[in-house]
């Protein structure tokens, strides 16, 4: 149980460090780093790899650019993690686009359409 707790705490700390690193980013970028959100982090059991799911306030093309931005600056973010969190070795960071928000919106829209269709059927009968 304590190993799971430690993993969850490390994931939370990494999320905080990366959010702060995004806020303080000084390099050039096509996107605004302050609009990038770290949605969730999945740390591997051996803590060597961290899958980081990011979201960006913008269209699909901008979201892909946000993931590319994170990948291009992977060293900067890994250094931030290494400096701020006591670990034997900083995990390798792997960035992915988070589709959870879009998927939930799509599902709710589908459910609303089904509800409308059912109401129309009841009215017609």
UniProtKB/Swiss-Prot annotation:
InterPro entries: KH_dom-like_a/b, RbfA, RbfA_dom_sf, Ribosome-bd_factorA_CS
Keywords assigned by UniProt, alphabetized: Cytoplasm, Ribosome biogenesis
Major subcellular location class: cytoplasm
One Gene Ontology term of the molecular function aspect: ribosomal small subunit binding
Places the protein is found: Cytoplasm
GO biological process: maturation of SSU-rRNA
Any matching Pfam family: RBFA
One GO cellular component term noted in the UniProt record for this chain: cytosol
Subunit organization: Monomer. Binds 30S ribosomal subunits, but not 50S ribosomal subunits or 70S ribosomes.
UniProt function note: One of several proteins that assist in the late maturation steps of the functional core of the 30S ribosomal subunit. Associates with free 30S ribosomal subunits (but not with 30S subunits that are part of 70S ribosomes or polysomes). Required for efficient processing of 16S rRNA. May interact with the 5'-terminal helix region of 16S rRNA.
Similarity comment text for this entry: Belongs to the RbfA family.
UniProt name for this protein: Ribosome-binding factor A
Classification of source organism: Bacteria, Thermotogati, Thermotogota, Thermotogae, Kosmotogales
Gene name of this polypeptide: rbfA
